[in-house]
C-alpha cells in the first residue's frame, strides 16, 4: 500500500486524475463490442451562445452519474460531446461580442468571424467540461457546423424531400423583424403586454355605423373582411353586406364565422393579412385577398396620403390613432393586458408575413407522435405530459428556413433555364455537403441557377444529434451504415425540461419520419438550477454563479455532490449548505480511509486480492457478518436506484450508510478489535480488518459515479490497483453473499449503544467516559457482541437480565 498523505489537496488531485484518465483513455468507446453490450448516449451539445453556467454543470453531471454507473456495471459506453455552434444563437453571440452585424460586413466575412469566435468559445467549453469530470470520449466530438455534420443534416433534408415530408410553399410564416428571419412555432414565447383596445367606427355601404375594437389599428390598410359570430343576433341582419373601412375607404365583406368570440370587444372583428393566426384561418377558409403592408424590417409599406409609409409599427399605430381622433372615428380606448407572441431570443413582437419557405410536415403526424411519446421511457415520468401538451398545441408545420448566414445551407438551387424557370434542383448525395452559393447542381452552369440563400433552422440539425454521431440517416442516406445500425436507436437522451418542445420533439419527429422509430429508449429530463433565494438566475440580478469560481473554492467532487442531491427533473436552488456538506463528506471519506489504511498491512496479500465472497469464511465475528449483510443490501438498493435513473436516491442511501452505519457505528465498534493491542483476539482482529478492507472498497465504488476524484485517489492508495476504479466492470457486486445470523442481536446492540451515547451527551460526558456497569434487560447479547459493546461504551461490566422483550438499560458511572 502507498503511504497515506497527511491531507487531501483537491486542486492538485483533480488535475492529476483528469490528466491520467485522458492519457489512459479509460472512457474510450470500443466499436468492436456489440450494441447489446453498449450503452449509447445522445449527449446535449451545448449551444455556443455564451458562457457555460452552473446550470450546465448541474445537468451534465447528472447524466454523468448514470453513464459512469453503466460503465462500472460492465457496459461499453458511447458517450460523445458535441457543440451546437451554428444558427441564430451563435450569430447573436458574435454580433454582441464583436459589435458587428452580418448585413454590414458581408456574408463571407461574417461567417469567418463566427468560425473564429466558435473555435475560441469551444476551447473554453472543453476546459470546463473536463474540470467537472465528464467521462465523455472526446474522440467522438462533433460540431453542428462541421462539414460532416452539414453533410448529415443535408442528407436528412434530402431524405425527407424524397419521402414527401418536406415541402416549399409561399404561405404565412412567423417573422422576427429584429433578427430578420422566419421562425418556427417552438421559437416563440407568450409575453404579457400592456396595450390599448381601440374602439373604431366603421360604416356599412348603407351608412349604418359599426364599432370594431382592435389593438392594432395600424393594420387598417390590410383589412380584407369584417367577421361576426353566426349566432350573434346583433349582426345577423348584416349578412351579405359590405363595410367601408375608416380612413382608407376600402369595401370589404361582412362575413359570419364561429371563431369570433362574441364576448370580446363588440363582437365584430376585422380580418387583416395578417394580425394573428385566426386571420390566416379566415383568409384561407373564406378565400380572401392578400394585402401585405408590413416589411421584413418591421416597417409599413403603404404609400398614401395618410403618411404612414416607412414608419415603424408603433409609430404607424400612433399616427393612425391621432388621425382617427381628429376625424372623430375613435370612440374610446381601454387599457388592457394581453398575450403577445414574441421571439424567444430577441424578445421582439412577431409579425406574420407571406414568403416562400421550407416546411417539415408536422400537423399530419400529431397522432403518431403522441403514440411515440407514450412508447418512450420518461425519467421522471411526469415530464411526458409536457411533450403531449406541446404536440396537442401544434398548429403550424415546422418552418425550417432561416434568413441568416451562419448555418447549414439548403442543398437547393432554382433553375433559370428557359422552359423550367423556378424548378427546384436538389444536390446529389455524392455532392454533400454543398453550399449553393459556391457549388452547382450537376449539369448546370452558374448563370442557369439561382442559389437558395437561406440556411436551416439550427434545430433542423440539432434534431439529428443522434445521427451526427451515428453517421447515418436511413437505409438510403448513410455515410457509414454499419456504424449507424450499431448505434441507432440510442439508449439515452438527457436534456433540460424547457427544450422538450424543441429538441426532444424535433428529434422524435425526425426519427419517426426517417426510420419509423424512436431515437432513444429513455429520456432523462433535468430541472433548472435556481439562485439561493429560488429566483431564476440572471445577469441583471447579479446572481449568476460562475462554475470556475466554485470549482476553485470547492472542487469538482463537491459540486457534483450538490448536483447529486437534487432529484431528477426538480428545479433546485444553489445551496452553500449543501456545498459545505459535500466538503465535509470528502474529508470524512479521507479520514475513514486513513483509519482503514493503518491496519491493512496485517492482511495477507491473497486475502486482499480475493473477492469478498471468496473470503467469506474468514470473517468470523458476528457484528462483522451483520455489517457485510447490510453492505450487500446497500449495494442492491443503490444498483436498483441507478438502473432506474434515481441517482439522488442512490447518493442519499450511500452517504447515509457511510456516515451513520460505517463511520458512526462500525468503525467505532470494531476499532478495539482492529487494534487488538494485547493480541487477545487475533481471529476477531483479522475479521474486522478484512471487513474494513472490503466495506471501504465497496463504498468507494458506490461513491465513484458521483465523486470520481476522491474515490480514485483513495482507491489507488488503499488498494494499489493498476487499473482505475472507473473502468468497465468495477461496480460493487456481492451476489450470493449472505450470512445466516440473528440480525436482532446486532440491531439490539446498536439500540443500546444509542441509549448510552444519549446518556453521556445529556450528562456532558465524553464519549469515552468510563462506565462501571451496564445493566441490560430485554435482550442477551452473544459473547462477541457483548465484548464489542463493552469496548465501544468503555464499560467495565455488563449484566443481562431477562424481564420482558423491551430493551431497558441502567447505567452506573
UniProtKB/Swiss-Prot annotation:
The keyword Aminoacyl-tRNA synthetase appears for this protein: yes
Motif ('HIGH' region): 46-56
A Pfam family annotated for this UniProt entry: Anticodon_1
EC number(s) from the headed UniProt entry: 6.1.1.9
Renumbered ranges of motif 'KMSKS' region: 536-540
Major site of localization recorded for this protein: cytoplasm
Alphabetical list of SUPFAM superfamilies matching this protein: Anticodon-binding domain of a subclass of class I aminoacyl-tRNA synthetases (SSF47323), Nucleotidylyl transferase (SSF52374), ValRS/IleRS/LeuRS editing domain (SSF50677)
Top EC group: ligase
InterPro entries per record: aa-tRNA-synth_I_CS, aa-tRNA-synth_Ia, Anticodon_Ia_Val, M/V/L/I-tRNA-synth_anticd-bd, Rossmann-like_a/b/a_fold, tRNAsynth_Ia_anticodon-bd, Val/Leu/Ile-tRNA-synth_edit, Valine-tRNA_ligase_type_2
Subcellular location field: Cytoplasm
GO molecular function term, any single one: valine-tRNA ligase activity
Entry keyword annotation includes Ubl conjugation: no
Subunit structure: Monomer.
Function statement: Catalyzes the attachment of valine to tRNA(Val). As ValRS can inadvertently accommodate and process structurally similar amino acids such as threonine, to avoid such errors, it has a 'posttransfer' editing activity that hydrolyzes mischarged Thr-tRNA(Val) in a tRNA-dependent manner.
Comment block on domains: ValRS has two distinct active sites: one for aminoacylation and one for editing. The misactivated threonine is translocated from the active site to the editing site.
Protein family per UniProt: Belongs to the class-I aminoacyl-tRNA synthetase family. ValS type 2 subfamily.
Name of protein: Valine--tRNA ligase
Gene that this sequence comes from: valS
Amino acid at each position: 500500500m502507498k503511504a497515506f498523505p497527511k491531507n487531501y489537496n483537491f486542486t492538485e488531485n483533480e488535475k492529476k486524475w483528469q490528466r491520467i484518465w485522458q492519457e489512459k483513455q479509460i472512457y474510450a468507446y470500443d466499436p468492436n463490442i456489440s450494441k447489446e453490450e453498449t450503452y449509447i448516449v445522445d449527449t446535449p451539445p451545448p449551444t455556443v451562445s455564451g458562457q457555460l453556467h452552473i446550470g450546465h454543470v448541474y445537468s451534465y453531471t447528472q447524466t454523468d452519474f448514470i453513464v459512469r454507473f453503466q460503465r462500472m456495471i460492465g457496459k461499453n459506453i458511447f458517450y460523445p460531446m458535441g457543440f451546437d455552434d451554428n444558427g441564430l444563437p451563435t450569430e447573436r453571440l458574435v454580433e454582441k461580442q464583436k459589435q458587428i452585424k452580418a448585413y454590414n460586413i458581408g456574408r463571407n466575412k461574417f461567417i469567418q468571424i463566427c468560425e473564429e469566435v466558435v473555435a475560441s468559445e469551444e476551447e473554453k467549453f472543453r476546459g470546463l467540461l473536463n474540470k467537472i469530470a465528464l467521462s465523455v470520449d472526446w474522440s467522438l466530438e462533433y460540431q453542428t457546423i462541421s462539414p460532416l455534420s452539414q453533410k448529415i443534416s443535408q442528407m436528412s433534408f434530402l431524405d425527407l424531400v424524397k419521402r414527401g415530408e418536406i415541402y416549399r410553399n409561399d404561405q404565412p410564416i412567423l417573422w422576427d423583424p429584429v433578427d430578420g428571419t422566419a421562425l418556427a412555432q417552438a421559437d416563440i414565447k407568450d409575453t404579457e403586454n400592456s396595450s390599448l383596445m381601440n374602439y373604431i367606427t366603421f360604416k356599412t355601404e348603407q351608412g349604418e355605423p359599426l364599432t370594431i375594437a382592435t389593438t392594432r389599428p395600424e393594420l387598417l390598410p390590410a383589412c380584407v373582411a369584417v367577421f361576426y359570430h353566426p349566432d350573434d343576433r346583433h349582426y345577423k341582419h348584416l349578412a351579405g353586406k359590405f363595410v367601408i373601412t375608416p380612413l382608407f375607404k376600402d369595401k370589404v365583406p361582412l362575413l359570419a364565422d364561429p371563431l369570433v368570440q362574441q364576448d370580446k370587444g363588440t363582437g365584430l372583428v376585422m380580418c387583416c393579412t395578417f394580425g394573428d393566426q385566426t386571420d390566416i384561418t379566415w383568409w384561407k377558409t373564406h378565400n380572401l385577398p392578400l394585402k401585405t403592408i408590413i416589411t421584413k424590417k418591421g416597417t409599413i409599406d403603404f404609400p398614401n396620403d395618410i403618411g404612414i409609409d416607412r414608419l415603424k409599427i408603433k409609430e404607424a399605430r400612433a399616427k393612425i390613432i391621432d388621425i382617427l381622433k381628429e376625424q372623430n372615428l375613435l370612440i374610446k380606448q381601454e387599457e388592457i393586458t394581453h398575450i403577445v407572441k414574441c421571439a424567444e431570443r430577441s424578445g421582439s413582437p412577431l409579425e406574420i408575413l407571406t414568403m416562400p419557405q421550407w416546411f417539415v410536415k408536422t400537423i399530419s403526424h400529431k397522432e403518431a407522435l403522441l403514440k411515440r411519446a407514450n412508447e418512450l421511457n420518461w425519467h421522471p415520468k411526469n415530464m411526458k405530459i409536457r411533450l403531449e401538451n406541446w404536440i396537442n398545441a401544434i398548429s403550424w408545420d415546422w418552418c425550417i428556413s432561416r434568413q441568416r448566414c451562419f448555418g447549414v445551407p439548403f442543398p437547393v438551387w432554382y433553375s433559370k433555364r428557359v422552359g423550367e424557370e423556378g424548378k427546384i434542383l436538389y444536390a446529389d448525395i455524392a455532392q454533400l455537403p454543398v453550399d449553393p452559393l459556391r457549388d452547382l447542381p450537376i449539369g448546370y452552369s452558374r448563370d442557369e441557377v439561382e442559389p437558395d440563400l437561406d440556411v436551416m433552422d439550427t434545430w433542423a440539425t440539432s434534431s439529428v444529434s443522434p445521427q451526427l454521431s451515428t453517421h447515418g440517416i436511413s437505409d438510403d442516406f448513410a455515410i457509414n451504415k454499419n456504424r449507424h445500425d450499431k448505434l441507432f436507436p440510442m439508449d439515452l437522451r438527457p436534456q433540460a425540461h424547457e427544450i422538450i418542445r424543441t429538441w426532444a420533439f424535433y428529434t422524435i419527429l425526425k426519427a419517426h419520419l426517417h426510420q419509423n422509430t424512436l431515437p432513444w429508449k429513455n429520456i432523462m429530463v433535468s430541472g433548472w438550477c435556481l439562485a439561493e433565494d429560488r429566483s431564476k438566475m440572471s445577469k441583471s440580478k447579479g446572481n449568476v454563479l460562475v462554475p470556475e469560481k466554485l470549482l476553485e473554492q470547492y472542487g469538482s467532487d463537491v459540486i457534483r455532490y450538490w448536483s447529486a442531491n437534487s432529484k431528477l427533473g426538480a428545479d433546485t436552488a444553489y445551496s452553500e449548505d449543501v456545498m459545505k456538506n459535500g466538503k465535509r463528506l470528502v474529508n470524512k471519506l479521507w479520514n475513514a480511509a486513513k483509519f482503514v489504511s493503518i491496519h491493512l498491512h496485517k492482511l495477507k496479500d491473497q486475502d486482499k486480492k480475493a473477492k469478498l465472497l471468496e473470503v467469506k469464511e474468514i470473517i468470523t465475528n458476528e457484528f462483522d457478518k451483520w455489517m457485510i449483510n447490510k453492505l450487500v443490501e446497500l449495494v442492491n438498493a443503490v444498483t436498483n436506484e441507478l438502473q432506474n435513473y434515481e441517482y439522488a436516491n442512490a447518493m442519499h442511501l450511500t452517504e447515509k450508510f457511510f456516515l451513520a452505519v460505517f463511520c458512526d457505528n462500525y468503525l467505532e465498534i470494531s476499532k478495539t478489535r482492529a487494534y487488538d493491542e494485547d493480541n487477545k483476539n487475533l481471529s476477531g482482529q483479522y475479521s474486522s480488518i478484512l471487513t474494513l478492507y472490503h466495506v471501504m472498497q465497496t463504498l468507494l465504488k458506490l461513491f465513484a459515479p458521483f465523486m470520481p476524484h476522491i474515490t480514485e485517489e483513495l482507491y489507488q492508495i488503499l488498494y494499489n490497483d493498476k487499473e482505475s476504479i472507473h473502468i468497465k466492470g468495477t461496480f460493487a457486486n456481492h451476489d450470493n453473499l449472505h450470512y445466516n445470523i440473528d440480525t436482532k442481536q446486532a440491531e439490539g446492540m446498536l439500540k443500546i449503544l444509542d441509549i448510552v451515547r444519549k446518556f453521556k451527551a445529556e450528562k456532558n460526558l465524553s464519549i469515552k467516559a468510563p462506565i462501571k456497569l451496564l445493566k441490560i434487560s430485554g435482550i442477551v447479547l452473544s459473547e462477541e457482541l457483548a465484548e464489542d459493546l463493552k469496548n465501544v461504551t468503555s464499560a467495565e461490566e455488563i449484566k443481562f437480565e431477562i424481564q420482558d422483550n423491551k430493551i431497558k438499560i441502567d447505567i452506573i458511572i
